[in-house]
Amino acid sequence: MSDRLTLLRPDDWHIHLRDGAVLPHTVADVARTFGRAIIMPNLVPPVRNAQQADAYRQRILAARPAGSRFEPLMVLYLTDQTTPEDIRTAKASGFVHAAKLYPAGATTNSDSGVTSIDKIFPALEAMAEVGMLLLVHGEVTRGEIDVFDREKVFIDEHLRRVVERFPTLKVVFEHITTGEAVQFVNEASANVAATITAHHLLYNRNHMLVGGIRPHFYCLPILKRNTHQASLLDAATSGSGKFFLGTDSAPHAQHAKENACGCAGCYTAYAAIELYAEAFEQRNALDKLEGFASLHGPAFYGLPANQDTITLVRDEWTAPASLPFGELTVIPLRAGEKLRWRLEEHA
């Protein structure tokens, strides 16, 4: 087995960079590895139109390390009030590549999200017409639905209806976590794809709950049982172009995670491709990593693949115990633990 793995430079099709003083830290971490990233719009207030997306994009570009060519791909935050004109203006900008459906209350900063799917049908119709992708956080939020079942129920109650109603709309089912989601994507048309996180490939709910509650494993959608983890590994390593890399790296300050009511999100951007390599190596599928990380996403988005490369080397190193996060700190996933692959840094 080779101790070096060279890939076309990957992209991250789902990341949270946050805003303000933390941007120099979060942008540096993603730009170290990825050529482009789909930037989540769930700021406070959210990124609802092309003008706000451009302002956020400029802040991200200003935070890039010297010499970086990292490109942020912007996303609109759908609300009940999003209009077809909002969609057309965003598409015409050239820098907004998708719009994001957050069911209201489903995750961090989703309170302004969609309260009823039917309310955004005019916007979805416009998206289908102009070729803008729909990104979906696929969980219902009704209190009587068990948190471990919310993805499956969303598929049955909402997602099937959306893809049937808008067959030409390209849909990315983001950060899928269940066997049911894998099956849905596999059986859907070529216009439906999914992203998978490194933490959902490497971990299941036992890692979060057995032997004590580990808040840095807490994310939404929540980690599921190991049978679902196995389904995700099958999908990611299958070679299917329907599945591609999206870290959902979502930093929160240490005090907000280590809390009686801790925030949801795992910070993986600092070592994302290294973590994915571990997952693919578990399945003896390192030969499938380039497709998943570097090729399938651009193809689905209608963009060219990156032309430069990165190299991973099998060289054990210890993840930092904490990382700077503005004036605070963030605890990364695997803090203080050994990682088996290291990104080779070029001078």
Swiss-Prot record:
Cofactor: Zn(2+)
Modified residues annotated as N6-carboxylysine in this record: 100
Catalytic activity reported: (S)-dihydroorotate + H2O = N-carbamoyl-L-aspartate + H(+)
UniProt keyword list: Hydrolase, Metal-binding, Pyrimidine biosynthesis, Zinc
Pathway: Pyrimidine metabolism; UMP biosynthesis via de novo pathway; (S)-dihydroorotate from bicarbonate: step 3/3
Binding sites annotated in the UniProt record for Zn(2+) 1: 14, 16, 100, 248
Active site: 248
Any single GO BP term: 'de novo' pyrimidine nucleobase biosynthetic process
EC number: 3.5.2.3
Any single Gene Ontology cellular-component annotation: cytosol
Residue numbers binding substrate: 16-18, 42, 137, 220, 252, 264
Gene3D superfamilies with a match to the protein in the record: Metal-dependent hydrolases
Bound cofactor: record note: Binds 2 Zn(2+) ions per subunit.
Domain of life of the native organism: Bacteria
Pfam families the UniProt entry points to: Amidohydro_1
GO terms, molecular function: dihydroorotase activity; zinc ion binding
Record-listed Zn(2+) 2 binding positions: 100, 137, 175
Function: Catalyzes the reversible cyclization of carbamoyl aspartate to dihydroorotate.
Assembly, per entry: Homodimer.
Family to which this protein belongs: Belongs to the metallo-dependent hydrolases superfamily. DHOase family. Class II DHOase subfamily.
Descriptive protein name: Dihydroorotase
Organism: Pseudomonas savastanoi pv. phaseolicola (strain 1448A / Race 6)
